[in-house]
């Protein structure tokens, strides 16, 4: 097959961009060396092959250990069958598959319109986002959880609600943060899906308690209440409301009353905006807002947790294709989320510049929660939603026949037709023979890493005395 000049130019551009992205992701950000996946593998290996508890395991020479709910360890049991390098390969493939599904849900129709070139450029740009590249290089599970949650959004929006809630339930059993999506299902008046999510999460938790009773008892009575096991609240990678208050109060403890007030305000804004989105049938917008609220409300939101911002970015870029100002805003936010800017205040987040700069991703998340364009169903609804709901119903047999307009007496489209884009024009399109045109976190770490390579960890905590 011969390539046209345009195709050759596009191919060269993609190859150059992919090379630059590969070099950047391999050298500029400090390599995380699959650290979190090493924790998962080591904890499961210690449990299965050495009879220990997953919560007693520590990476040799560190205080880093397993911090997820017990079902997360049960779901990772297959790791015990592999060596570390095979487990890394499997984890990489899972993250790639999750990323492909997330892209399909968020931008599948647009990517199909732009073909291989649009897909290649999108993948390269996605790989530059700090939350995405950190999820891959740490061997984290965030993209898999996002895929599970968006899978439920897809089921609800395509009339396959029978299994909706399973993904959210599994995600909540693996990590607590996605449980907020169960509340969204209640706001959406989807009690069956919410019940399914609760049932799946409860069943998974009971299964884990049966498989590992001692570890489950320890987690639910002690570990779940101890945030110091996860990391220091004031560490710069913690881009949550709690992180802002902790850095502001450092070295004192952050005010619980201040956090409660801020959390209530965020909850109020989230409920208000999510209900507006749902009222307009904007399912993707409601799920995007919920991901933003989850990042803000969680006690600890490491930078790699911010993959929950991907639905919001997809909406912003999609709306930006119609409103240039939003496209500029989306581009600026994208650059900031690629920049690792918060690490400039790694050693000292004091002063006004520290308050503003070290919390950059928090301000982005807050701004999106307040200003994300939702409630505009025809624009923000996912493509698979538009196909199932925007198709005009077939005319009733009893419907009166439409009288074509006389060429000398053109009819004006109704206001409803103008609003919906279904104004009736001449019956035949003569441009192409009558054919119409197509419509266009798993561990605490040392308080101060001793070297730049140790800064690679996304989260730190005071080591046990």
Predicted regions and their residues:
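Hydrophobic/aromatic-rich transmembrane helices and adjacent perimembrane loops
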Residues: 303-318
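Hydrophobic transmembrane alpha-helices
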Residues: 83, 98, 175-178, 182, ...
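Primarily membrane-embedded glycan-assembly and transfer machineries that use lipid-linked glycans
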Residues: 1-163, 188-306, 353, 380-389, ...
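Low-acidity, Ser/Thr- and Arg-rich intrinsically disordered low-complexity segments
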Residues: 396, 401-402, 406-408, 413-420, ...
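Transmembrane helices and adjacent periplasmic/lumenal helix-loop junctions
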Residues: 168-185, 297-305
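Aromatic-enriched
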Residues: 317-397, 465
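Active-site catalytic microenvironments for nucleophilic, acid-base chemistry
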Residues: 81, 185, 314-315, 319
């Amino acid at each position: 097959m011969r390539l046209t000049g345009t195709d050759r130019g596009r191919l060269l551009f993609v190859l150059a961009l992919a090379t630059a992205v590969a070099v950047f992701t391999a050298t500029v950000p400090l390599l995380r060396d699959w650290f979190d996946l090493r924790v998962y593998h080591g904890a499961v290996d210690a449990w299965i092959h050495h009879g220990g508890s997953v919560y007693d395991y520590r990476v040799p020479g560190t205080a880093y250990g397993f911090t997820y709910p017990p079902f997360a360890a049960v779901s990772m049991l297959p790791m015990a069958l592999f060596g570390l390098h095979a487990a890394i390969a499997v984890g990489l493939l899972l993250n790639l598959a999750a990323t492909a599904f997330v892209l399909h849900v968020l931008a599948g129709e647009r990517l199909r319109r732009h073909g291989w070139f649009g897909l290649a450029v999108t993948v390269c740009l996605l790989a530059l986002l700090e939350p995405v590249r950190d999820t891959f290089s740490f061997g984290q599970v965030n993209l898999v959880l996002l895929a599970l949650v968006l899978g439920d959004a897809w089921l609800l929006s395509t009339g396959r609600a029978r299994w909706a809630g399973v993904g959210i339930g599994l995600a909540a059993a693996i990590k607590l943060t996605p449980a907020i999506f169960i509340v969204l299902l209640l706001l959406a008046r989807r009690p069956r899906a919410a019940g399914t999510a609760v049932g799946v999460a409860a069943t998974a938790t009971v299964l884990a308690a049966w498989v590992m009773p001692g570890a489950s008892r320890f987690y639910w009575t002690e570990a779940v209440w101890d945030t110091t096991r996860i990391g220091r609240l004031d560490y710069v990678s913690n881009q949550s409301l709690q992180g802002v208050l902790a850095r502001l109060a450092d070295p004192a403890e952050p005010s619980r009353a201040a956090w409660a007030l801020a959390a209530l305000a965020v909850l109020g804004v989230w409920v208000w905006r999510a209900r507006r989105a749902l009222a307009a049938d904007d399912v993707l917008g409601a799920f995007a807002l919920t991901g933003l609220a989850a990042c803000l409300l969680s006690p600890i939101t490491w930078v790699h947790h911010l993959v929950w911002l991907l639905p919001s970015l997809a909406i912003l870029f999609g709306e930006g294709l119609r409103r240039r100002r939003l496209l500029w805003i989306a581009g600026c936010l994208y650059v900031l989320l690629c920049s690792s800017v918060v690490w400039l205040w790694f050693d000292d987040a004091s002063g006004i510049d520290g308050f503003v700069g070290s919390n950059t991703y928090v301000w982005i998340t807050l701004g999106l929660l307040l200003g994300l364009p939702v409630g505009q169903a025809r624009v923000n609804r996912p493509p698979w939603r538009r196909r199932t709901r925007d198709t005009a119903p077939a005319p009733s047999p009893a419907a009166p026949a439409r009288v074509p307009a006389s060429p000398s007496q053109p009819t004006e489209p109704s206001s409803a037709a103008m609003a919906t884009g279904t104004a009736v024009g001449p019956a035949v399109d003569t441009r192409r023979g009558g054919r119409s045109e197509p419509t266009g976190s798993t561990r605490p770490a040392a308080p101060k890493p001793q070297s730049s390579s140790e800064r690679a960890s996304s989260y730190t905590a005071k080591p046990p005395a």
